[in-house]
């Protein structure tokens, strides 16, 4: 049985997030009409140089791929929800 390794980050419900688990990442962006709430699917990946968010689906459910360091984005636990 594979051991689950946790990232040390909690989601909006206080649950620890395992590495590689899909998350609903709420991203707040500025649009023409003001603030827009986008929901992207991301995973947390472990890297020697620091953990990253790996985004795998955009707000329309289309496949995408881009990464950001956890420390380079303005986010909080309320922006993350573990997808079951």
PLM regions: where:
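Secondary-structure transition motif
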Residues: 1-84
């Amino acid at each position: 049985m594979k051991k689950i390794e946790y990232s040390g980050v909690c989601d909006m419900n206080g649950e620890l997030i395992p590495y590689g688990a899909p998350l609903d990442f709420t991203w707040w962006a500025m649009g023409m009409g003001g603030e827009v709430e986008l929901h992207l699917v991301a995973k947390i990946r472990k890297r020697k140089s620091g953990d990253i968010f790996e985004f795998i689906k955009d707000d329309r459910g289309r496949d995408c791929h881009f990464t950001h360091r956890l420390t380079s984005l303005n986010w909080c636990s309320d922006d993350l929800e573990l997808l079951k």
